[in-house]
Amino acid sequence: MVSRSWLAALLAVGHLSSICRAQVDVPSVNNFRRRVFARGKHRPTSLSKDTQGISNECSASVIGDWVYYDGGEVSQVISGLSPQSQWRPSNPTNTTLSIDLTKSWTPEDVEIKETSKSAPKMMRQAIFTDNSSNSFYIWGGFTSYGAKIPDAKLWHFTPDGSGGGQWGTVLPHGNTAFTALTRSQGGAFVSTKDSGFYFGGFADSGSDPNPNGPVPGFLQFNYTATDTAWTNNSDSVPYSDYGTLVGATAHYAPYGPNGLIMIFGGGSHVIGTGQSVDNVGYLSFSTIYFMDPVTKVWYTQQTSGNAPGPRMWHCTVGVQGPNSTYEIFMYGGSNIANKETFDEVYILSLPGFVWQKANYTSAAPRDTQSCVVAGQRQMITFGGVNRMANNANSTLFFNEEDSFRQGVGVFDLTALAWKDAYEPTAAAYDSPDIVKAWYNEG
């Protein structure tokens, strides 16, 4: 005879198993709660007049007419149970997601396509987009809920042009150097014309078999190298006394013969094991550090205007203006020291290096979201949580229903306003009025 305690245990196991099976990567609109750490990149189909100068360095990979998102976690109502009532409040995303950018849609009715994947399920990994092959790679990140760290392999996704694609591993030239790299999470990553760059990061027990805390310097992955594709540049960098960086964004701006990689925000840690990922010294947005990706020479520029306050886990995108300006848009983020999550959009306009802030009422603070530019002048945001409103308690912030339906937001970069729908045929981008006014004033 089975005792009551054993019977209860068996029933509980069966219930948990059914909940696990019911978990999906794209919940219904009403069951969806939150999504975090989904990463990707946007690349226009071609450098036409409508898309030239668009750069997205902290979000999903737009290749052709689709934006791809990979990795992260999702929370949802399952069998009537809220996330905080389940055995864990979120679950890793098991598929690669994509959205069609040729169709009009609202966040509530947008179709999010799923593609099965053999690649590891990681959080905060880097995505490097190779424009020459219309494909992307993933590197680094951490596993959630104590899952086994995967072997050191370079995973590659080749889209099929219809929102799907194929995953596989590649053996980079100089593979010994690649496998010897410390695998970290939360670094700033960016793609240039021929390389992917990864700055800083934090090696913990979920990212590397031999975790050693904050990682200084930066990595370069040359897509076309015939000898050693991966190089570790551990020399000093100017943005931090320790050379470390976590929770920042890196942005590639098309200035000069080689372009420039710019670092925005984030925090820096003392080197060594035992450091907390939250114990950081914040980088200021009033000073911008940028590097020539070919010569590796660093430059520094002071900004003017209304600079953002210190923060981590924001996102950035950039668009070429019609009058030889280039605007970089920074959205969201959080400051653990001040216990604040932000719903703010700031604009840094080049060559003036002036900050402006979009004037709208904050309604949906979030960090760890992705953002891309699509439809010429629209920023699409994906995911994010209000971490500080819930004291960084994941059970609470995963339980909170997102005011962005399916976690998707649409922001007009010219009008500086949130929109109810995405329009692929929106008017061409023009610099916001507050940016044009600054230049007109001389």
Walk through the language-model features, giving the residues of each.
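Beta-propeller domains
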Residues: 23-49, 58-115, 140-168, 222-225
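Blade-edge beta-strand/turn elements of extracellular beta-propeller
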Residues: 40-48, 105-116, 157-179, 219-241, ...
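N-linked glycosylation sites
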Residues: 91-94, 131, 222, 232, ...
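Conserved short beta-strand element of beta-propeller blades
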Residues: 49-70, 74-76, 115-137, 154, ...
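Cleavable N-terminal signal peptides of Sec/SRP-targeted secreted and luminal proteins
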Residues: 4-21
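Beta-propeller blade signature
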Residues: 84-104, 149-163, 209-227, 276-296, ...
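Intrinsically disordered, low-complexity regions enriched in proline, serine, glycine
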Residues: 79-80, 148, 166, 208, ...
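Short, conserved, GDST-rich strand-edge loop motifs in beta-rich repeat architectures
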Residues: 73-91, 139-151, 201-213, 263-282, ...
